[in-house]
Amino acid sequence: MKKPLLLTLLCMILAGCDNPKSLESFTPEMASFSNEFDFDPLRGPVKDFSQTLMSENGEVAKQVTGTLSQEGCFDTLELHDLENNTGLALVLDANYYRDAQTLEKKVQLQGKCQLAALPSAGVTWETDDNGFVVSATGKEMKVEYRYDSEGYPLGKTTINSQNTLSVTAKPSADPRKKLDYTAVSRVNDRQVGNVTQSCEYDAYANPVDCRLVIVDESVKPAVSHHYTIKNRIDYY
């Protein structure tokens, strides 16, 4: 058997010879929603997913679940932050996301299904020419978001009358491992924390299992918190 043919067959058998250039980029909706609602963005034809953050004691700290249309719009999105006893459940209805229980209009949309406004909080979102949310403006604050060429979120800067909080993320140089990243948080240019994450990936280069370490540097000595993230993803 000729070597080129042998290599081709091996690449078909083993998931590891994919050309990184063939990877799908992060959609504007996926990247922007992950920024705003604090979950890891996913690639490809995602149908539904869940991300569960667990403490080192095995307790669920946070869970995010969502369903998406074939066009990449979030049909539903549900978030539960057990550590802070908060939650949110949204369901798509035309140009709004409604509260899944009260049916109150919560989030106004623009374009196909992108964030536009949160009327109750006086927040509006602005997008760039590619449809990514690049800023959020409220009564007393402004947030600016950054992305790389594939749409991966690189962090954000929040500015209010008293402080400037910046989060800067640096993903792995391996394009198939974008969710292996380090991030640094600063308040007024003073570093107050850092985050490191490493993951196992599926054939779509989406994270399956991750290990997350959050270091609080605002206290002395610094305190580290260790988590695991379990992802369940179904595709079209």
Swiss-Prot record:
Q: What keywords are assigned to this protein? A: Cell membrane, Lipoprotein, Membrane, Palmitate, Signal
Task: Name the lipidated positions (N-palmitoyl cysteine).
Answer: 17
> Signal sequence: where?
1-16
Q: What is its main location?
A: membrane
In this record, what's one Pfam family?
UPF0257
**GO CC term, one of those recorded:** plasma membrane
Q: Which InterPro entries match?
A: UPF0257
Entry's localization field? Cell membrane
Q: Which membrane topology term applies here?
A: Lipid-anchor
Residues bearing a lipid moiety (S-diacylglycerol cysteine):
17
UniProt similarity note: Belongs to the UPF0257 family.
Protein name (record): UPF0257 lipoprotein YnfC
